[in-house]
Amino acid sequence: MRVLAIESSCDETAVAIVEDGKLLSSVLSSQVNIHRKYGGVVPEIAARKHLENILFLLDEALDRASLKIDDIDVFAATQGPGLVGSLLVGLSLAKGLSISLNKPFVAVNHLIGHIYANFLSFPDLEYPFLVLLVSGGHTEILLAEDWNNFKRIGKTRDDAAGEAFDKVARLLGLGYPGGPEVELAARNGNPIYRFPRALNEKGNFDFSFSGLKTSVLYFLKNNPEARIEDVAAAFQEAVIDSLLTKTFAAAKTYGINKIVFAGGVAANTRLRERANEIAKEKDINIYFPPIEFCTDNAAMIAMVAYEKAKRGIFSPIDTNAIPYLSIVSL
């Protein structure tokens, strides 16, 4: 079974093809350089750029897989969450192809796609496992009990971790997107300052990063002589410490010995280093997607679509975008 999937939930336009769960091609066009001057994604511009790029990427994905459009058995696209204008570009194309070629259509939850990015490298990964989903818009700890059964056991009460990186990057005068910029600065810094870790009570697996952001703001006002690199390193350590302390504690509480990392922040090198150190201490198996599949891509969407399609689970052609789709929906 060949599945062609489209991802257009935010500012990356992507198309990928999998055959029986194996990746044949994956292409992507990023808009990061376009949105950088605005300090964030401009929805209207993002949707317009998706329209400009999507057909070229469709042809390129087919060419790289040495396939024609008639060779595709199932078409899929991200349904949400995301920017509604952006989502509609991918959904409209996938549904149009489905109608014109009389092939099934599958709508995919973008967040579950991030989890499934791990199956690209670890196809034999078995349930149950714990998930730390950490990105620009979401920070959650989930118990994955089966391919379509996700139980949320912790979430952010305010800012997502990736959002905190972006906001602190602006405070530090760094560029966009904030995550890579803060990480780069932190490599040349020393985490000599101590920023707060919120919600530390035992058994609480929720996160909070707004207070951390505010703490950095006031620290910079009161300590203008502080090196940006040191502040970046200290902030990064605070975020990573909070993420990993709660995630490994949740694994112990629920008796799970496998932790899967997902989302754009999972590309952070320091997060990976610390996670590996703790995992060795606690004898827990951890899984990270390849760096290129941590951020938005269509390969992860195709993997979810394949799992649904092989079970005969398809979506109605009048499926619409759901900008605030929850991960507990599939």
From Swiss-Prot:
Binding site for substrate: 133-137, 166, 179, 268
An annotated GO cellular component: cytoplasm
Cofactor note: Binds 1 Fe(2+) ion per subunit.
This protein's name: tRNA N6-adenosine threonylcarbamoyltransferase
Listed PROSITE patterns: GLYCOPROTEASE (PS01016)
Family, as annotated: Belongs to the KAE1 / TsaD family.
Protein function: Required for the formation of a threonylcarbamoyl group on adenosine at position 37 (t(6)A37) in tRNAs that read codons beginning with adenine. Is involved in the transfer of the threonylcarbamoyl moiety of threonylcarbamoyl-AMP (TC-AMP) to the N6 group of A37, together with TsaE and TsaB. TsaD likely plays a direct catalytic role in this reaction.
Cofactor: Fe(2+)
Keyword Cell division: no
Recorded superkingdom: Bacteria
Protein location: Cytoplasm
EC numbers, comma separated: 2.3.1.234
Lineage: Bacteria, Thermotogati, Thermotogota, Thermotogae, Kosmotogales
